[in-house]
């Protein structure tokens, strides 16, 4: 009584197909597939960015003992 048989699921599937139509269900399926692929690519790309960020940080740090100044000419006014 608590479990659904295959016939219950087939009836639910037929009702869903009648309500939404097969074209709409196909579009929703492809949209979900594209979203999952985009998510996986995003997660994969996020892991690749971490080593590049770690390598770039030390090269940006300047020697703390040096000071960059700009020389301006002194005017005699």
UniProtKB/Swiss-Prot annotation:
Keywords of the record: Cell inner membrane, Cell membrane, Membrane, Protein transport, Translocation, Transmembrane, Transmembrane helix, Transport
One Pfam family linked to the record: TatA_B_E
Family assignment from sequence similarity: Belongs to the TatA/E family.
Coiled-coil ranges per UniProt: none
Annotated segments matching region Disordered: 39-77
Quaternary context: The Tat system comprises two distinct complexes: a TatABC complex, containing multiple copies of TatA, TatB and TatC subunits, and a separate TatA complex, containing only TatA subunits. Substrates initially bind to the TatABC complex, which probably triggers association of the separate TatA complex to form the active translocon.
Record's signal peptide: none
GO molecular function, one term: protein transmembrane transporter activity
Gene field: tatA
Function recorded in the entry: Part of the twin-arginine translocation (Tat) system that transports large folded proteins containing a characteristic twin-arginine motif in their signal peptide across membranes. TatA could form the protein-conducting channel of the Tat system.
Subcellular location(s) per record: Cell inner membrane
Record protein name field: Sec-independent protein translocase protein TatA
Any single biological process term in GO: protein transport by the Tat complex
Domain of life: Bacteria
HAMAP family named among the record's database cross-references: TatA_E (MF_00236)
């Amino acid at each position: 009584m608590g479990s659904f048989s295959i016939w219950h699921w087939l009836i639910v599937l037929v009702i869903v197909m009648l309500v939404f139509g097969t074209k709409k269900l196909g579009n929703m399926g492809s949209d979900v597939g594209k979203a999952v692929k985009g998510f996986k690519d995003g997660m994969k790309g996020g892991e690749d960015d971490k080593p590049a960020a770690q390598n770039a940080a030390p090269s940006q740090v300047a020697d703390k003992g040096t000071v960059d100044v700009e020389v301006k000419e002194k005017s005699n006014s």
